[in-house]
Amino acid sequence: MNKKIVKTFKLGGKEITLTTGVVAEQADSAVMARMGDTVVLATVTSAPLKMEMDYFPLSLEYQEKLYAGGRIKGSRWVKRDGKPTDEEILVSRLIDRSIRPLFPKLYKREVQIIVSVLSVDGENMPSMLAAIAASAAVHTTTLPWKGPVGVVNLGYKDGKYIVNPTNSEMAESDLDLVVSSTSLVCISANAFTLASLASASFS
């Protein structure tokens, strides 16, 4: 049985708790991340080395489960989750582009990362929490990965930048910027001017 480890830190004044050694113990690693009542679970599994492959077979899937928000989708009889939404695809790509470059270029071992949203409180966004959980999960394996990755979401309102904004704060924000990096790996943003970005401070 894996030893339970709990780590808590603050980001933008909001407390984030990472827990490992509790669930999915057959995986290489599993990290549960909580911010408020938003909870995600990131699991990492890997297969034996396959030298015949000419690429790195990394697959990453971000899943927003319907039960996380207390929703039931579809007709009276169809209650299962459907194909990935645009949001799930975009978040999966964001996490993938943050994590993939930190593996060795010639690495050929198949790796699967699945991040499942278990609970959503309506205020704390699961997407950023998912990226943090995925980074922590990979970092706690024995895989040759040059992480961890830091992830932060930025909003902008009334001339001030908001670190780790809530859903309600983001609804009134002029900026939706996600930065994931060890130094600088990936930036994803919506609705901002170049002048606004140039004046931002990321210290």
Predicted regions and their residues:
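Gly/Lys-enriched N-terminal cap/neck module of very large, oligomeric protein machines
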Residues: 21, 26-32, 112, 147-151, ...
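Short strand-coil-strand connectors
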Residues: 10-14, 36, 157
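Stable alpha-helical structural segments in soluble proteins, enriched in small hydrophobic residues
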Residues: 98, 129-141
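Short, ordered loop/turn segments at secondary-structure junctions
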Residues: 21-23, 38, 44-47, 65, ...
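Mobile "lid/hinge" segments at catalytic clefts and subdomain interfaces of large enzymes
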Residues: 138, 142-203
